[in-house]
Swiss-Prot record:
GO terms, molecular function: ATP binding; magnesium ion binding; tetrahydrofolylpolyglutamate synthase activity; UDP-N-acetylmuramoylalanyl-D-glutamate-2,6-diaminopimelate ligase activity
Protein name in UniProt: UDP-N-acetylmuramoyl-L-alanyl-D-glutamate--2,6-diaminopimelate ligase
Mod. after translation: Carboxylation is probably crucial for Mg(2+) binding and, consequently, for the gamma-phosphate positioning of ATP.
Metabolic or biological pathway: Cell wall biogenesis; peptidoglycan biosynthesis
Alphabetical UniProt keywords: ATP-binding, Cell cycle, Cell division, Cell shape, Cell wall biogenesis/degradation, Cytoplasm, Ligase, Magnesium, Nucleotide-binding, Peptidoglycan synthesis
Top-rank taxon, per record: Bacteria
Entry-linked InterPro entries: Folylpolyglutamate_synth_CS, Mur-like_cat_sf, Mur_ligase_C, Mur_ligase_C_dom_sf, Mur_ligase_cen, Mur_ligase_N, MurE/MurF_N, UDP-N-AcMur-Glu-dNH2Pim_ligase
GO cellular component terms, A-Z: cytoplasm
Residues noted as binding UDP-N-acetyl-alpha-D-muramoyl-L-alanyl-D-glutamate in the record, renumbered to the chain: 43, 166-167, 193, 201
Species annotation: Chlorobaculum tepidum (strain ATCC 49652 / DSM 12025 / NBRC 103806 / TLS)
């Protein structure tokens, strides 16, 4: 794969304006000579020669920062409303929807790189990262150079680029697509969040395949209702290209809703149960689990009259579904089924996704997982309960993030109390909230169940490791791959994996 290139060459303003079509009203400036050096919606990121897009955000209105952007060197501004007084020395583009304009301008600035890639999008509450990373591994192992964009990072070959958001803003997203194309990628696999769909971050992208993993309560502080949340997720399937197909988890109650606007011949369905009504038999992929350990599962997969064995290097029935959907994407794209299964079984471990950490004598196992919703916590605990020896204990350390959906806190407390033998409540990115107040709300769902409450996450993990006996399994949930603890706007370095490794190293 070629060397990764950072940045992009300049673009003629006239060419960018053309990408907006007739909807943009243009005033002022000298577009004939203007060369744009960058596109951004963040006035703090403006550099001389940039085009600033004034987006009305959830917290702040970009129109209030137009002056700051011009002072920083912006030579053009796209906005929905002109300032009361404005200078003709700057080119003004008045647009009906600044979010869509940001996506269109960014795509044009980076040379329509996304059109040169086979795009595969994965959406759902849980399982996006695992499924997307599995698809990426499968494509690369099958000879299709693929980049990945998702939770925490963008990966192009062996090069990792940190990301703040699961699905970045359009200017960042199209920069990443450009880097992928320049590095020789033929495909991009990306997690597509509900926020990104509603906020038009993926506007103008057309997907060869789109995957729905599941839908459970999450982000209701943003979407307000499950119906709105489901509708947001379904928007992804409206962006399939002419050859595009959907892969739907038929076991999810919203499966039929997700597929409702698609022609039957564009839908593949996956099931580990008895759900057979969603798809034509030739388009059904079914898995039956035959063996499970903390190291992973084995399953028999049937599809289109064929039956094959599938090795899943992650524990839990839900990870069988994640791999089944990744496999279905491969078959849908024309990859040889045996090749697809071999590459999936050999996929690299995913940080913070059922990541196993063992004591030196391998008698005790800790599992780090990103489970931070009620459904994810329940599935993780159920998966580990199924592989915990009858004479051993299952323990969990977890908390709930601050400044996020408060409704889930007592529910997660209830789930932990019901499914684990030992529970330790602790902090998980309290952000601007009082950590003890968050734990009070989690505790409210535990119905008096005996547990420990240790707000210091490192101390909570240390105590949990001390309590482990031979054969016991400890789930440390909520943060997964994250290497920080966010407190009052400051991200302090902290890694569950590093903390566990240190605790096991000290164990006699």
């Amino acid at each position: 794969m070629k060397e990764i290139r950072e940045g992009a060459p300049g673009a003629q303003l006239d060419d960018l304006v053309a990408a907006l079509g007739a909807l943009a009203e243009r005033r002022g400036g000298d577009g004939a000579r203007a060369v744009i050096t960058g596109v951004t919606c963040d006035s703090r990121a403006v550099t001389p020669g940039a085009l600033f897009v004034a987006v009305r955000g959830l917290v702040a209105d970009g129109h209030h920062f137009i002056g700051a952007a011009i002072e920083a060197g912006a030579v053009a501004v796209a906005c929905e409303e002109l300032p009361a007084a404005y200078s003709d020395s700057v080119t003004w583009l008045v647009v009906p929807d600044a979010r869509k304009a940001l996506a269109e301008l960014s795509k044009a600035f980076y040379g329509n790189a996304s059109d040169k890639l086979m795009l595969i999008g994965v959406t759902g509450t849980n399982g996006k990262t695992t499924t997307a990373r599995l698809v990426t591994s499968m494509l690369n192992a099958s000879g299709v150079a693929a980049g990945y964009i998702g939770t925490g990072l963008c990966r192009i070959g062996n090069h990792d680029i940190p990301l703040e958001r699961t699905t970045p803003e359009p200017n960042r997203l199209h920069d990443l697509f450009r880097q992928m194309v320049d590095a020789g990628c033929r495909a991009a696999v990306m997690e597509v969040s509900s926020h990104s769909l509603v906020l038009d971050r993926v506007h103008g992208l057309f997907f060869r395949a789109a995957v729905f993993t599941n839908l459970t309560p999450e982000h209701l502080d943003f979407h307000e209702t499950m119906e709105e949340y489901a509708e947001a997720k379904r928007l992804l399937f409206d962006q399939l290209n002419a050859e595009g197909f959907a892969v739907i988890n038929a076991d999810d109650p919203r499966a039929e809703f997700m597929a409702a606007r698609l022609a039957p011949e564009r839908v593949f369905c996956c099931s580990t149960g008895d759900n057979t009504s969603l798809c034509d038999p030739a388009r059904r992929f079914h898995a039956v689990i035959t063996a499970s350990t903390v190291e992973g599962s084995k399953a028999d997969v049937t599809f289109d009259g064929q039956s094959m064995a599938m090795q899943v290097p992650l524990p839990g029935a839900y990870n069988v579904m994640n791999m089944l959907e990744a496999f279905t994407v491969g078959v849908g794209l024309g990859i040889d089924p045996a090749t697809a299964l071999r590459s999936l079984a050999a996929a690299d471990a995913i940080a913070g996704r059922m990541e196993r950490i063992w004591s030196r004598d391998r008698s005790r196992c800790a599992v780090v997982d990103y489970a931070h919703t009620p459904d994810a916590l329940q599935k993780a605990l159920e998966a580990l309960r199924a592989v915990t020896p009858a004479d051993a204990k299952l323990a969990v350390v977890f908390g709930c993030g601050g400044n996020r959906d408060r409704q889930k806190r007592p529910e997660m407390g209830r789930i932990a109390a019901e499914l684990a033998d030992r529970v330790i409540l602790t902090s998980d990115n309290p952000r601007d909230e009082n950590p003890e107040a968050i734990l009070d709300e989690v505790e409210a769902g535990m119905a008096g169940r005996v547990h420990l409450r240790i707000a210091d996450r490192a101390e909570a993990i240390r105590r949990a490791v001390e309590q482990l006996g031979a054969g016991d399994i400890l789930l440390v949930a909520g943060k997964g791959h994250e290497a920080y603890q966010e407190i009052r706007g400051v991200k302090h370095h902290f890694s569950d994996r590093e903390c566990l490794e240190a605790c096991f190293a000290q164990m006699k």
